[in-house]
Amino acid sequence: MRIGIIGLGFVGLSLASVLASKNYNVIGIDTDKKKCLEIENGITPIFEPNLEKTLRIGLKKSLIISNEFSCLKDCDIIFVTVGTPQKNNGKIELSMIKKATSAIGQTIRKSKKNPIIFIKSTVIPGTVENIVLPILEKQSRKKANKDFGVISNPEFLQESNAIHDTKYPHAIILGGPETKYMKKAKAIFLKIHPNVKMIITKYQTAEIIKYANNSFLATKISFINQLSNICQNIPNADIDDVAKAIGLDPRIGKLFLNAGPGYGGSCLPKDMSALINFADSIGVNSTFLKAVEKTNHEQIDNIISLMKKELGKIKCKKITILGTAFKPNTNDIRASKSIELIKKLLKNNAKITVHDPKALENTKKIFGSKINYVTSLQDALDKSHCVVIMTHWKQYNQLNKNSLRIMKSKIVIDTRRILIGKELGGRYFAVGIGR
C-alpha cells in the first residue's frame, strides 16, 4: 500500500513521519522546494517535540519527499493536509485545497489506480461535496466514489503533542457515503489504529465535528478566563483552586481549564472565527460564539489596564515579554496572545523587549526592528519597568528575587501563575488571584 500526503506542514509532516516510521510506503508532497530539501535532510521546518527524530526514522525506512504531484500516480491512499488559513474577513482561504484537489484529479486521470482521497484539512460544511468533488471529477474525468473514493477525515492534533496524537488519536472520524471505499477506509484505520473508536457519518457532519470540537475547547478557555477576572477582584480567591474543583466533576473535566491570556495558535482562533462566519452565512444567530471570541480578545486589554494602573503612562517604558510562542514546546506564534499584546503596547509607544527560547526568529518576521530581541533572561530583565510572563516555558520558573534586582520598577504580571509563593521583592500580580 502506497500512501501520498499533500502538504508537509504541522499535520502532514507529523502524519508522514509516523506512518513511514511504521514501515508504510509514504510519499510526502509540498510545493515549497526549499522546505522539501530541508525535510529530505532530516530538518523539520517547525519545532515540535519528537518530530525530527520520527522524521529521520521515516526517511531511513520508506519516506520519500517531493514537490511533484505526479508522484501520487501510483498511490492507493492520498491524504490532503494543506492549510486553510484565515482571511481578513474571518472566513477560511480555500485556494490551497482547490489547487491540491485539482492536481490530484489531473494525476489520477492518468492512473489505473482507484485511490481513496482523505480530506484532513479543516473546511466548513459543504466544502467536500460542493468544491472538492466537482474539482476532482472535472480534472480526473472520472466519477467520485465510483472510480475513486473521497472521505472527510478531520484531524485533532495538539501542537507540542503532535507525534503522540498522530500515533494515538482519541477518535477516527470518517465522513462520506457507504461505498466500497468507505469499507476499505474502515479496514485501513482498523489496521493502523485497532483500538480507537471510529465514527462513520456524512461529509457535512464530519466537517462540522472539527469546528464543534475546537469551538468547545475555546469556550472552556474563555469561560475559565472570565471566572479568572472575577476571582482577581475577590480578596484571596484563587482561580487554580476553582478550576481544580470544577474539573473533578466528570461532566466538566479538568482539561482546558488553565486560566491565562487567552487562546491562540493556528486552530482555535481561526476555527472559531470561521464557524461564526459560517453560522451567519446560513442565517443562524451566533451570539454565544461571538461572546466567547469577545472574552478572548478582552484578556489582553485587561493585562494592559493592569500595567497602566501600576506604571501610569507606559509611553517609553521598557516592557519585557517572556514568551511569544502561543504555548510552550513550539515555535508557532500564529494568533499568539503575546503578539497581540506587543502590537497594542507598541501603539502606546512602549519599548518592547522579548525573550523566547524557540520563537524569536518567527517573532522577528512580524516586528523586525520595532522591538528588541534577547536570548538571555538577564538581558530581558535589565532596566525593565515591567515583565509579563506570557508563555509557560520551564526556564521562567527559575525567576526569583535576585533575578529582578536589575529591573527598574520590579513589576511582574504573571499570566500563567508560575511564580506564586516566591519572594520576588517587587510588585507581583498573578492573573486570576485576588489580592
Regions found by a protein language model. Give the residues of each.
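Structural/interface elements that position substrates and couple domains in central-metabolism enzymes
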Residues: M1-R435
